[in-house]
A protein has these predicted regions:
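DNA-dependent DNA polymerase catalytic subunits
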Residues: 1-211
C-alpha cells in the first residue's frame, strides 16, 4: 500500500489550544522509508501536502521546481540514498574484481566497489565497508576508468580521492528516489510532472558549499 493521508480528525485528538489535531501519515512511499534523510523528507512534504490539499498543478509544478533548488544546496551526504548492507559477505565473496555476483543488489554493489577502489587505488585512512554498516549510495557518471555507475561511502565521509576519480551524477541522485516519489503522485492525479532536471543546471558551488 502506497499512500499519503491528510488526517483531520485522529479519534478526537486535540492540540494545546483545544483544536482538532491535523496530521499527515505516509505509508509505502519513499517519504515513509529510511532511504531518505530528514531534510529531504521535509522538502518532499512541501510539495506533496499542498498538492493534496489544493490540487493545483501549476502551484505543484512551482513547488517542485523550488524543491529542486533547495535540493541542490544540501550537502552531498544529505541527498544520497541511505541503505544498510545486510548481505555484503555473501555477494562480495561471490564476486571477483569488477565481475559481481548475479543477484547482487545495487547498494551492495556500490559498497563492494567502495572497498575495491580503496584497495586498487591504495587509499589510506579509509575503512572498508562491512556487513551491517549503514551507507550512503553515490550515483556516478560512468565515464570513469573503472566504468562504474555508483559507489558507497560510510559515516558521511567522501574521500577526496573519489572526487578525483569520479564525476558525481547529481541528476540521478535527484531523480531517484525523490523525484520518482513525487512523480508517482502526479500519476495518481493524472498530471504530467515537469522535467525540472532539464530546465536547470547544477551549480557546483551550491553542491559543495558549506554545510
Amino acid at each position: 500500500k502506497r499512500q499519503a493521508l491528510h488526517c483531520v480528525d485522529n479519534e478526537g485528538e486535540v492540540d494545546l489550544e483545544g483544536n482538532l489535531k491535523i496530521s499527515w501519515k505516509y505509508t509505502g512511499i519513499e517519504l515513509a522509508k529510511s532511504i531518505m534523510s530528514k531534510p529531504i523528507k521535509e522538502i518532499g512534504k512541501k510539495v506533496i501536502e499542498p498538492m493534496i490539499l489544493h490540487q493545483n498543478k501549476y502551484e505543484t509544478d512551482k513547488r517542485l521546481r523550488e524543491a529542486y533548488e533547495e535540493f541542490k544546496k544540501l550537502p552531498l551526504t544529505t541527498i544520497c540514498k541511505i541503505a544498510r548492507v545486510k548481505t555484503f559477505n555473501k555477494y562480495s565473496d561471490g564476486s571477483s574484481g569488477f565481475q559481481t555476483m548475479k543477484g547482487m543488489q545495487a547498494h551492495v554493489r556500490a559498497a563492494y566497489y567502495h572497498n575495491l577502489i580503496i584497495e586498487k587505488e591504495k587509499i589510506h585512512g579509509v575503512q572498508p565497508i562491512r556487513e551491517g554498516d549503514t551507507i550512503q549510495v553515490i550515483a556516478l557518471k560512468p565515464n570513469n576508468k573503472y566504468r562504474i555507475d555508483s559507489i558507497a561511502i560510510r559515516d558521511g565521509y567522501m574521500p577526496p580521492e573519489f572526487l578525483e576519480l569520479f564525476e558525481i551524477d547529481y541528476r540521478r541522485i535527484f531523480e531517484k528516489p525523490f523525484y520518482a516519489c513525487i512523480a508517482s503522485l502526479y500519476k495518481v492525479a493524472n498530471w504530467t510532472p515537469p522535467n525540472v532536471t532539464d530546465e536547470y543546471e547544477f551549480e557546483l558551488f551550491d553542491l559543495f558549499g558549506e554545510e
